[in-house]
Amino acid sequence: MTNVCDLTDRKCKPCEGGVPPLEMEEAEKLLKQLEQGWQLADNKISRTFSFKNYYQTMAFVNAIAWVSHREDHHPDMMVGYDWCRVEYMTHAIGGLSENDFICAAKVDMLFKS
């Protein structure tokens, strides 16, 4: 079974469509490997992170941008003064792929550091 260490050690694989999204059962298994707070709904996973101030929020957003660039897999983000909501979905397949969970695990690791 995949665990968080496995997910953070993996690299995203290019996905340009032509493969089906993860089945709900597999997505739920992978969701259990992430930190608490991630929600699975509407063919995406999302989590809202809270911070003490705007500077910490923006530092986190920029760190996510760096990880996203390295993985070539980008989330949708909504940002407020002391919060950031991160949503992953593989748009090319209209649902979730393992890439979404790999990146979510890496975002969790960033938040803990």
From Swiss-Prot:
Catalytic reaction annotation: (4aS,6R)-4a-hydroxy-L-erythro-5,6,7,8-tetrahydrobiopterin = (6R)-L-erythro-6,7-dihydrobiopterin + H2O
Lyase keyword on record: yes
Enzyme class, broadest EC rank: lyase
Coiled-coil regions listed in the entry: none
GO molecular function: 4-alpha-hydroxytetrahydrobiopterin dehydratase activity
Gene Ontology biological-process annotations: tetrahydrobiopterin biosynthetic process
Keywords for the protein's UniProt record, in alphabetical order: Lyase
EC number: 4.2.1.96
Pfam families named in the record: Pterin_4a (PF01329)
Disulfide bridge partners, by residue number: none
InterPro entries: PCD_sf, Pterin_deHydtase
Family that this chain belongs to: Belongs to the pterin-4-alpha-carbinolamine dehydratase family.
Protein name: Putative pterin-4-alpha-carbinolamine dehydratase
Organism: Nitrosomonas europaea (strain ATCC 19718 / CIP 103999 / KCTC 2705 / NBRC 14298)
